[in-house]
């Protein structure tokens, strides 16, 4: 009876956590849209968003056209993109850590970041700044295909081969990018590349969030159904074999989906590090290791985290904007040091 009561309490606590995070996300979105170089009352922000969504323009008739443009056309798309990016990167990090059975893995292990950087760098140096997102996505896809090809060649894909392949491809594309910068980049190009590689949501708009929204939502729904396989992956290949599960096949499918999500997000936002590393760890403190519970918490917490990181990037310096990657690194780097030193990862 005591065990049944404990399970019931655990379920109740989990429901409370989910409700709290959902409420926190809604409050975060409204507050983030209100904050910026020009602060807007939360009540006005709510009226504008609610009026636009319900097509009741009379609700926000008292607001100026400039205020409406700031809220609806500039800030809301940006906040929604940061929500999608945070949720997507955190989800990919969670799945990656289960897939390779390594708690300090993140999506960029597939070479996505270095491939995207190469594609973006090439187009920036060539003066084709309008096509940077497309170039970054193509570069990310090429790098991922190389990693998966190397890791699965001449036998089944293993976690060790995947990590080694990712390391090699990352080094290769980083060398290509550095060569292009050294040979053909001017001062303006270098600044653009530097800002892009540290992440930015400055170019967010309604049209630019359509693809990330479709991809992130679709992949999220898929992985919400894959908790049994993800839990099995955490137990290791030998356990999976006894259960009759082909982990090599699932790894290929999961890695491909992770690469697609990460590639789309990187092409839209640049390189934003540590989200896929730290959010799954923090989420496990609330949801445990069962991915049926873990995945929803990861998605909500990742979205909230990146929205606030973007708020800091927008408001911390007056009349200027900082790369969002600075703030994710300031939180992520100390946390990474903590989990390596305190959790004894990598020790025999």
Model regions and ranges:
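Alpha-helical transmembrane segments in inner-membrane proteins
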Residues: 1-348
């Amino acid at each position: 009876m005591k065990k049944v009561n404990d399970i019931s309490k655990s379920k109740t606590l989990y429901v409370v956590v989910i409700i709290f995070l959902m409420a926190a996300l809604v409050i975060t979105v409204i507050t983030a849209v209100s904050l910026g170089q020009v602060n807007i009352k939360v009540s006005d922000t709510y009226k504008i968003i609610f009026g636009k969504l319900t097509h009741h323009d009379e609700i926000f008739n008292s607001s100026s056209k400039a205020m409406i443009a700031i809220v609806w056309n500039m800030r809301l798309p940006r906040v929604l993109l940061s929500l999608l990016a945070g949720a997507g990167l955190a989800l990919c990090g969670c799945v990656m850590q289960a897939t390779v059975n390594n708690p300090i893995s993140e999506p960029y292990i597939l070479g996505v970041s270095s491939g995207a950087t190469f594609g973006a760098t090439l187009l920036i140096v060539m003066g084709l700044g309008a096509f940077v997102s497309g170039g970054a996505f193509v570069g990310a896809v090429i790098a991922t295909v190389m990693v998966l090809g190397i890791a699965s060649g001449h036998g089944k894909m293993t976690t060790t081969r995947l990590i080694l392949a990712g390391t090699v491809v990352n080094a290769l594309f980083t060398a290509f990018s550095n060569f292009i910068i050294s040979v053909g980049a001017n001062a303006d190009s270098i600044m653009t590349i530097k800002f892009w590689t540290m992440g930015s949501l400055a170019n967010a708009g309604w049209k630019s969030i359509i693809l990330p929204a479709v991809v992130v939502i679709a992949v999220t729904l898929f992985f919400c159904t894959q908790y049994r396989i993800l839990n099995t992956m955490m137990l290791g290949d030998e356990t999976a074999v006894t259960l009759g599960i082909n982990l090599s096949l699932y790894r290929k499918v999961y890695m491909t989906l992770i690469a697609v999500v990460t590639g789309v997000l990187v092409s839209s936002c640049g390189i934003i590090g540590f989200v896929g590393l730290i959010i799954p760890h923090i989420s496990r403190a609330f949801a445990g290791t069962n991915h049926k519970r873990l995945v929803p918490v990861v998605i909500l917490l990742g979205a909230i985290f990146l929205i606030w990181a973007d708020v800091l990037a927008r408001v911390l310096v007056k009349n200027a904007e900082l790369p969002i990657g600075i703030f994710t690194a300031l939180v992520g780097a100390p946390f990474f040091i903590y989990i390596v030193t305190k959790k004894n990862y990598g020790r025999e």
